[in-house]
């Protein structure tokens, strides 16, 4: 595998929602697609998502210390970089400020890693905007995580927010 290109960071989204499950399922069902990727999030959240899937095949979590380490791992494991304080177990399907904060912190970490050149790209799993706003400052300043990405990029480059273009792509099977 090429190691001259940084890996891709996936943020787990809202731990009370479908984001962690989507990511875990991708690693289980399409390991060839996730080969140069890692989760920038919480190990416990991802363990819980894997358990939810009740998959016939075991998928171990590899706790990594840096984004680059994801490129050195063998296939059939889920690399997770713990970028937030360990999360408590949160209830499924509930708007929770703690979940919003975790989701926002993961996106912020991944954004900064991309701006430093440590990751080639960011993929964000779904997060709940209401939970993000419930987390309070600074998360309630942004309508969603796209605006958070824009604000952090503007801050990093030293340009006014209005002059910072945002390029994003939505991807699905349809």
What spans do the regions from the language model cover?
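Anion-binding alpha/beta catalytic cores of soluble intermediary-metabolism enzymes, centered on
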Residues: 1-174
